[in-house]
Each structure stands twice: as structure tokens, then as C-alpha cells.
Amino acid sequence: MTHEQKNILSVRDMEREEIDKLLCSAAAFDRGNYTGRELEGKILAVLFFEPSTRTRMSFSAAMMRLGGKILNLGSVEATSITKGETLSDTIRVISGYCDAIVLRHPKEGAARLASEVASVPVINGGDGAGQHPSQTLLDLFTIRESMRIENIDVGLQGDLRYGRTVHSLAFALAKYNNVRLHTIAPDGLDFPRYIKEDLRDIGVELIAHDHIEQALPELDVLYVTRLQRERFPDPVAFANYASTYRITPELLECAKPGMIVLHPLPRVDEIDPAVDSLPCAKYFEQAHNGVPIRMAMLNEVIN
């Protein structure tokens, strides 16, 4: 890695000024303020070792909108990784084929490892239960379109233990003034202790709720995540939790006026489709915001 090389691995590494710069840049791209030649002649390697729809496609769309090209890993089974090649060796080789790498990997810390051996910038597209900075930046971008990111109450509901999107978002929101985090999670799926301790150490107010009804009147943002069926060995327990944590139009009648509902997608049963047509439902708009925010990220690290 060269000294000047810029990576985006975790929002915890970023200053608020860096985040705000990317959000402003994304807003300009979203308004159509670009030529389509910003990254002409540049190549982005898209290395995904886990399934993805939105992250993979929006990074690809972002690169192409700026005039660049995509080098896609394709199926992991068709690569030398199945022969035992290490991630480090794979990254070293692919660095010679491209101008930047976006990496998704099931192992936490994989993106940081890749950045240490790569000769081009690395963007973390999600690593295990760790960080997902591009998702967090588009989450912030979506919130900022509805309200100022300060003096707000944000509810985080669902799988907070293994969900990398909520881990990243919590630390990003901690960089803004007077943001209070409300957690609503099943037993055993709240934030890990080390994350709670780290958040409290940097002054974040964490408020735990047993039921979503307790939190809704206070929230400006409700961020819902998918409960993962594989975390529940008992299918009856999963069904009970899924129904308890399901967001419905009737439930939202007690929400604070102006509250917005976000979800990193894909959703399963946690949000009733009847919510989709309500003014508070911003999750499809949130997904669409992935393109301008990733345009901003690619332009920043490559140019």
C-alpha cells in the first residue's frame, strides 16, 4: 500500500468532515452534476465472496455512470481460491489489474487485511459481522434528506448482535451531536458487550426497550433489520419473535410525526408490505441512494 493511497474500511476510521464531504458529493451526483467521464479509463475490481444484490449492482452502476469499467470476480468456485490461494495473494494479483477494489468477505477484518497488501485503494463492501461503510453512508444520506443529523432519536430494531449495518451506523451517528440510540432486540441479539462499551466510551446514550411500542413516540428514525432464521434453533421461538417485531401500519399509528422507517434490505417478514405506501417508508429510496453515495466514494478514492 502506498502512503498516499486512500481506503474506506470503516466509518470508525473517518472524521465527521470526511463523511460530510462524501454526503455533499453524493448530493451533487444525485442532482446529475457529473460528466460521466470522471473515471474514464479506470477499472474497479468487484470481489464478492458472499451473495449480494444491492451493494454489488450499485457499485457497478456507480462506476459505469462515472465512465469507468468493471472487473467482476464472478463465481468464487471458478477461481484459484478453491485451489487454496490465500486472500492476500488474490488481492496482490488483482491489484495489478485495476485501479480500486471493492471487497465483500465473510471474515471480519478481511478488508483491512486486503488494504495492507493491495497496491490500489480498497473499499469495504461488508466483512462478516464487522463493518459496512458504504451502507452506512447511504443510510446517513437518506436521513439527511429528511432531517438534520443532530439532536435526533434513532431506533435500531432486529438483529443487533450480528448485523454489520447497525454496527457501522451506530458508530457513524456517534460522530454527530446529541444523537440518542434506542435498541429493540430479542434476547441474545442485542449489541455485543464490546460495542456497547465502545459506544458509551465515546459518549453515546443507549436506551434499551423491551417493546417497539415504548420507543415509537420518541423516534425520528426507525432502522429495522432482518431477524436471521438461522440464529434461532427453535422455529417456534423464531415465529414468535418475528410476529412480535413486525412493523405494521397499525403499529405506526403511535409513531412520532415525521418519523421515517429505514431498512438495509432484503426484508423478509419484518415490515408489512402495507407500510410501503406510507410517507414514512423510505427504504426503497434508501436503496436507490446507494448509487450516488458509491459514486462519491469511488471518485474520492480513485481520483
Swiss-Prot record:
SUPFAM superfamilies per record: Aspartate/ornithine carbamoyltransferase
PROSITE patterns according to UniProt: CARBAMOYLTRANSFERASE (PS00097)
Classification via Pfam families: OTCace (PF00185), OTCace_N (PF02729)
Recorded metabolic or biological pathway in which this protein acts: Pyrimidine metabolism; UMP biosynthesis via de novo pathway; (S)-dihydroorotate from bicarbonate: step 2/3
Coiled coil: none
Gene Ontology molecular-function annotations: amino acid binding; aspartate carbamoyltransferase activity
UniProt signal peptide: none
One of the GO BP terms on file: amino acid metabolic process
Keywords, alphabetical: Pyrimidine biosynthesis, Transferase
Ligand binding (carbamoyl phosphate): 54-55, 104, 132, 135, 265-266
EC number: 2.1.3.2
Binding site for L-aspartate: 83, 164, 226
The reaction(s) this protein catalyses: carbamoyl phosphate + L-aspartate = N-carbamoyl-L-aspartate + phosphate + H(+)
Recorded family membership: Belongs to the aspartate/ornithine carbamoyltransferase superfamily. ATCase family.
Stored PANTHER family: ASPARTATE CARBAMOYLTRANSFERASE, ORNITHINE CARBAMOYLTRANSFERASE, MITOCHONDRIAL
Cited function: Catalyzes the condensation of carbamoyl phosphate and aspartate to form carbamoyl aspartate and inorganic phosphate, the committed step in the de novo pyrimidine nucleotide biosynthesis pathway.
Subunit text: Heterooligomer of catalytic and regulatory chains.
Designated name of the protein: Aspartate carbamoyltransferase catalytic subunit
Organism name: Methanocorpusculum labreanum (strain ATCC 43576 / DSM 4855 / Z)
Origin organism lineage: Archaea, Methanobacteriati, Methanobacteriota, Stenosarchaea group, Methanomicrobia
Name of the coding gene: pyrB
